[in-house]
Amino acid sequence: MKELQTYILLILLFCLPITSIGQINQSINKSKDSTIKVIIKDTSLTGRKIRSDQFYDTLKLKASKNKFTKAALDLILIQEPEKGLFIGEENIRKERYFDLYEGKTIRKIEIIKLDVFGPPLYDSSTTPFLTWAQNAGNKTHVKTRDLIIKNNLLFSEGDTIDPTQLIDNERLFRELDYIKDATIQVAEIPGNKNLVDVLVITKDLYSAGFYLDLWNYRSGSIEVYENNLAGIGHKIRGRWLIDTYESPSMGYAFNYKINNLGRTFIKSGIQYYKAFNTEKIEIKAFRSFFSYNTKWAGHVSFSQTSTLRDIKKIDTTLINVRLNYSTQDLWIARSLLLKTQNIKYANRTRLVIGARYINNKFYKGPEISERFNFDYHDNQILLGSIAFSRQKFYTSNLIYAFGKTEDIPVGLLAQIDIGFEKDEFFNRPYAGFILANGIYYPKIGYLNFRTELGGLYYDKKIEQGVVKFNAKTISNIHYLKNIKLRSFLNVNYTRGINRFPDEKIYFKSNNDIWGFNTNELYGLKKLSFNSELVAFTNLYMYNFRFVFFGFGDIGFIGPENKSVFRNNLYSGVGLGVRVRNENLVFKTFQIKFAFYPSVPSDMDPFYLLVSGESYLKHNYYDPQAPTTIDF
């Protein structure tokens, strides 16, 4: 009966956003090359805006009679801005706009930096009413320095206009942790058809913040951070952790990151963690294929870890073992642009060749053998890769963020990884394959799928093999009066092939059944379905927007030689709320409640989480560092 109730609720969650709820109001601009740019047009604010203003005016009039109530009201209420919350309809795509100036020489670059709390990026001529708290925020915030903005430009004065490069540059600005949005405009020079000026307009986030994570009533963490230290784009974070179940019960972590070293677009950082019998230090540097014409990418990292862990002995008894190990990781890749007849992916198609070396060394560890506790073997892995990639971006909003511009990748990645593992017990060749694709369907929404398979070859057979499949759909926006609805559906499948005896997979809280954490359910094969229906409301409080959601997850897990559907079904359903002010770097405040109709003995049927949540990220189709696929 419980499973039947769960099925009914899941069906409702899956079907509700797909049915015709209200009027679907979308503007889709099509160009001659059939490229589609998705624009969500918000027409539901007008009536509510009038009623909201009347309510606020009445409330403010009453509160103004008392100094204390007036000050308190200024802290929590502002008038909802007329523009800037949603992407407006454009007459032409930005790419077509930049095409008008292709090949012209850049005479001068001018930078304009808007206030954190102020006019929206796409209508900077307006002068909105600001509360005293917002004015204080603008005065205490250090805007990103001009030098840092110029360091993040892909072009310089004297260069010629490259439309694709300008599009990439806007996206790169939006990917920075301290920039809310950015736009690039081109201005003609009167009397000179060959010269233009470029205007770069940016809007910062308020870069200092903190968040509180409550895992349960006996454990949690507090983090403070500055994402744009002194306006130079450096990030510094400190975290204090407490868990009364552990001894010692308190710990801390520190992280320092530089986003762009001297205009090389190399990200570097150092992090240190010491808590709950674990100490780790890591130094790393990373450069991605950040633009269509980037030729070189790679990373290098060094880490040292010491930790206590409960590990099985060969006789299957558990023993608390001190692990002390180090890891060195080096990857380098070269990109070659390919010519294509597909206009949609012109200058967006490439072939990438890469190589990677990983060295894992254990100085202290558990009892091991050739086929036991493989994760604690000393090993060296050398991998090479060849990848075909094509990728471009559309802009939309109200997907993972609460109204700001989001870049949606579409494209294809096909990558082959081949290499060799030198283990302390054996030497084995490795082969793996990755295929990923992202598509936008105007009548349905966004579809992404990813397939991974790989394994090592030893003693005339494949061992430690794995097959993974993930499919994700994001629906178009549907309207229910003033509420905007969007649904997210996910399917995850994992199967192990000839894994070692002590290798098992478990349900993962974030990928399978949310909040479902147990050590009693495991296997070599699992399948899960996730559904979330998100309601974007027009409820604001001091620019904090409220988003409500409901979710339903089901999963199966079991042995390799048994159909996954013949295992017991486990499920979870729940509700939650997310709150965020997109002018701040504060993580999204989230309250999430779940109920599980059937649970193993080491779990409770109810779970409540209060936490800070970072934005989820879309799957990109850039070539990746070759790797052995995780099980």
Which sequence ranges carry the predicted segments?
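Bacterial N-terminal signal peptides
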Residues: 9-17
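Immediate N-terminus of the mature polypeptide
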Residues: 2-4, 20-462, 473-631
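Amphipathic hydrophobic-ligand
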Residues: 466-467
